[in-house]
């Protein structure tokens, strides 16, 4: 794990100190011997990489993974944000307090949901090695609810199953998970699934190859979302009890809002939470999912820094980035996220008519060529879990290879945020009204 510094990105460079992970004593592999894999994103050799790409690879090899397989051939194309995303993923996978069988069950559930063949193959083996029964793995592979789960696993299964299939979490399920694993456990479960959603998107868009001689395991499911079909979020379950707390970190005041995650005052925070809050207050504030993120100061800080990069330092035009964000918020039915970014989308040049069409589940008319390329790319992913050759070529032609990755990471980051907000039932802002209605089918 690297030492975190609050300002990760200045002038497009990664500025972070390197410290050996506490659980690593072996020398990191030689990066010059690294062999990356990919299809649409052609693998790079270490000597061909930019300084920022080499930094990302060095961090991966020195960290818990000690390698760069899977999504990193893709994320390497935008290394500043890819480096932060990898650290968030490392916190969720390796530095959580969750039991290993629960961690691997959540990962294969997410891989099954997104039909990510490489991810499934890798973590199916890890699940079995960590004590997940073969019958449970097989049930998840075929889209069935497993029987014979231990209570502590069933609790986690219910949370992720509800979140992926309804895009919401019931009161009973939230309470059961919180009582067993605490608020940090809830954050880590949702964050873990969200991270592997980004992993799935990276792998599937790249068409990442399976190991030689290994056929894909997962068959298409007739109904991968049994509750809502291929639709968006169901209505928010239960009675909402939003709360708002105003507090101060030193001389600077801040506000935190939430529902199931009751906002903390500064005095209620642990030293690690205070440190994270001090950084946030000095930068972009404590709005949105921050009240949830602070429950895990390690993973939450990396997610905060990843969000800073996504929000302010991407290479794609703001209009196309905001289009990606509101499409993601619409898919997840994330009311707070939608309201925050619908205005930003209009300010960036997307017309009110197009934003309204997306809110209502209609394909916007009169899109420009660049808007249509991005719209097709994001909606096709949410509908099919893939990107066709034509769609991939069109969006790459508009934004370039790095731009494609910036769109993937933007969708992936705001998907994580949407999942966290929906789990909390984060209330919309004062004086605002929810705009998104339940949709029974995806955007055309």
PLM segments and residue spans:
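Hydrophobic helical h-region of N-terminal Sec-dependent signal peptides
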Residues: 6-14
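Positively charged n-region of N-terminal signal peptides that target proteins for export
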Residues: 1-4
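Hydrophobic alpha-helical segments
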Residues: 18-444
């Amino acid at each position: 794990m690297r030492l975190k510094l609050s300002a990760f990105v200045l002038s497009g460079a990664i500025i972070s100190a390197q410290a050996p992970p506490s659980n690593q004593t072996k020398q990191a592999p030689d990066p010059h011997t690294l062999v990356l894999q990919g299809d649409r994103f052609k693998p790079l050799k270490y000597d061909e990489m930019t300084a920022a790409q080499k930094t990302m690879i060095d961090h991966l090899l020195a960290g818990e993974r000690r390698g760069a397989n899977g999504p990193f051939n893709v994320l390497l194309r935008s290394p500043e944000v890819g480096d932060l995303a990898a650290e968030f993923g490392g916190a969720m996978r390796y530095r959580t307090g969750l039991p290993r069988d629960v961690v691997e069950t959540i990962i294969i559930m997410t891989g099954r949901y997104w039909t990510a063949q490489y991810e499934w193959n890798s973590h199916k083996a890890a699940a079995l090695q960590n004590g997940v029964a073969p019958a449970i793995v097989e049930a998840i592979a075929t889209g069935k609810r497993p029987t014979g789960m231990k209570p502590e696993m069933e609790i986690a299964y219910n949370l992720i199953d509800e979140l992926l299939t309804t895009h919401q979490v019931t009161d009973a399920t939230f309470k059961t998970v919180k009582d067993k694993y605490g608020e940090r456990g809830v954050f880590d479960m949702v964050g873990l699934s969200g991270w592997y959603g980004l992993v799935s998107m990276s792998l599937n868009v790249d068409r990442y190859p399976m190991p030689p001689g290994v056929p894909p395991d997962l068959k298409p499911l007739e109904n991968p979302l049994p509750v809502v079909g291929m639709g968006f979020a169901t209505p928010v379950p239960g009675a909402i009890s939003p709360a708002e707390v105003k507090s101060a970190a030193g001389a600077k005041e801040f506000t935190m809002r939430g529902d199931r995650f009751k906002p903390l005052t500064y005095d209620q925070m642990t030293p690690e939470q205070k440190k994270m809050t001090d950084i946030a207050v000095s930068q972009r504030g404590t709005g949105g999912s921050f009240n949830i993120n602070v429950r895990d100061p390690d993973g939450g800080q990396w997610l905060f820094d990843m969000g800073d990069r996504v929000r302010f330092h991407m290479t794609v035009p703001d209009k196309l980035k905001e289009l990606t964000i509101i499409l993601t918020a619409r898919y997840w039915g994330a009311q707070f996220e939608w309201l925050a970014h619908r205005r930003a989308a209009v300010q960036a040049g997307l017309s009110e008519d197009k934003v309204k069409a997306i809110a209502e589940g209609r394909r916007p008319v009169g899109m420009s060529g660049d808007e249509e390329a991005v719209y097709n790319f994001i909606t096709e992913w949410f509908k099919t879990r893939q990107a066709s050759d034509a769609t991939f070529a069109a969006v790459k032609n508009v934004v370039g290879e790095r731009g494609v990755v910036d769109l993937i990471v933007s969708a992936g980051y705001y998907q994580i945020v949407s999942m966290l907000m929906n789990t909390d039932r984060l209330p919309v802002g004062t004086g605002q009204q929810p705009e998104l209605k339940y949709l029974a089918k995806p955007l055309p």
